[in-house]
Amino acid sequence: MPQRANTLTLGTDRALYVGEIPATGWHCHASPVLLMGLSGRFALHWGAGRMETCRSALVAAGVEHLFDPRGEVVALVYLEPDSPEARSLRGVFQRQGGVLPDVAAPVGARAAIEGHLRAFDLPALLHRYLLQAAPPLDPRVARSLHVLRRPQQAPGRLARAGLASGVQLSASRFNHLFRAEMGVSLRSYRVWSQVRLAMAGLAVSPRLTDAALHGDFADSAHFSRMFRQTFGMTPSSVLKPLKQVTLLD
């Protein structure tokens, strides 16, 4: 069991998990993630037998990997693909590959690092060359994200056809636009969005069954399958140790 209070902070376009977690299985998700070892080095596996032990790493959306904290306290910063930081990282991922080890700039004491993490201050945490100017998100994709992130407010519009008609595009054109703007498929992002919404439900109720319903999953078994596919871990191993869930406006 974790030795410290694990915490989860969720914002509209970013999330932070801090604490001790088990090693994951192979998985990929529809958002880039910054991994940081707060108390020591972790192991990261990807590709055809590639492995690094490091104190920090960036993993692009859609890249299959295995993360082993090796018992250390870690921080995981998930950036929605439309966030300014995620968009500014797309260029360096395209040039250097989907996994970038040892990306953190020297910050100093662990307390300072955790302060920057809680503020989601990536420019203070990462080497400057990693973050580059990116064009604004297409407003049609931005409108579809508003619907995807609030499924209870738009029943029946979460299917590809409904989202496409909402921005006056054909389904195939919308699919192409979404992937071009977000870097991930609509299908992958829809699952990711549901899992995030389910985790936000933990701020209201600690029961995983209630979280599954909050995420618009058919049942807790469906939620569990999608969670394992997304994070490579069971929901209970990650969410039950949480002592604090904070939702940001």
Features from the language model and the residues they span:
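Short hydrophobic/aromatic patch on the recognition helix
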Residues: 174, 178, 222-223, 227
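Short, Lys/Arg-enriched N-terminal segment that forms or immediately precedes the first helix
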Residues: 16-19, 125-133, 175-182
